[in-house]
Amino acid sequence: HGRVFPKTDKSRTIIQALENKIQELGASILTNTEVVSVKKVDKQFQVKSSDQTFTSDKLIVTTGGKSYPSTGSTGFGHDIARHFKLHVTELEAAESPLLTDFPHKALQGISLDDVTLSYGKHKITHDLLFTHFGLSGPAALRLSSFVKGGEIAHLDFLPNQSQENLKTYFEENREKSVKNTLKALVPERVAEFLAEDKADSKVKQLRPKDLENIISQLKGMEIPITGKMSLAKSFVTKGGVDLKEINPKTLESKKVPHLHFA
């Protein structure tokens, strides 16, 4: 999930770099030209638009997935792959916000920095946002690649603190209210949510099991995942042309010579 940005911090710089390379190679750019079909006749590819036919010895398909259709993605690249009898794996939403039943209604609008959201062996430490439907922000988007719905995720509000350290912290602040003690660790509304009806009690008044429960919530709140947003509302399509059928060095199809996917 590493990201690289141009020095200008502007997407236009990337576009210009691609355009410059295309011009350097003597190629043409056709805009407002929708490809309607692709086939191979003898040893050449035929690419048809509504009013033109283009032929080439090689074909590179870079149509993107089926997510984020406002960018022009329709999944047509998968249709091309299927036409050439290539295997297309199941398509799923990835880099998608997560839908939950709990606790987003109580915490809606709260953003958290550098928390750890995990499911099984997958642990993502990044920023997180509670929304009216569930979870968003980088941590949720990245975890979405590993869930479908029906899983239990765990949220660690304080990944840099151990449970033992937190026990010591509460003991050192035993004369303070539970809410104020928690407020020094997490946003106020999260503190109120975790303290429940003991917000105004002093830490020393908590039963051992109540304190243990608060610390457990801080280190691993259970969040049932009910699903994720549709492909149309996701940033990335998980799945596509089976990589077993693609040469990793050239991105060429192993079944169809000179057909590349990128």
PLM-predicted stretches and their roles:
Residues 1-5, 26, 85-95:
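A short alpha-helix-loop-beta-strand transition element characteristic
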Residues 31-44:
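A conserved short coil-to-beta-strand element within the FAD-binding core of flavoproteins
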Residues 1-28, 33:
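Conserved N-terminal/central alpha/beta ligand/cofactor-binding core
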Residues 35, 54-73, 81-82, 128-133, ...:
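Short hydrophobic core segments
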Residues 7-15, 94-103, 227-245:
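Flavin (FAD/FMN) cofactor-binding core of flavoprotein oxidoreductases
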Residues 86-90, 96-209:
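An anion/pyrophosphate-binding glycine-rich loop and adjacent beta-alpha core
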Residues 29-33, 49, 90-92:
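Short loop/edge segments at beta-strand edges and connector loops
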Residues 31, 192-262:
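A glycine-rich dinucleotide-binding beta-alpha-beta segment and adjacent secondary-structure elements
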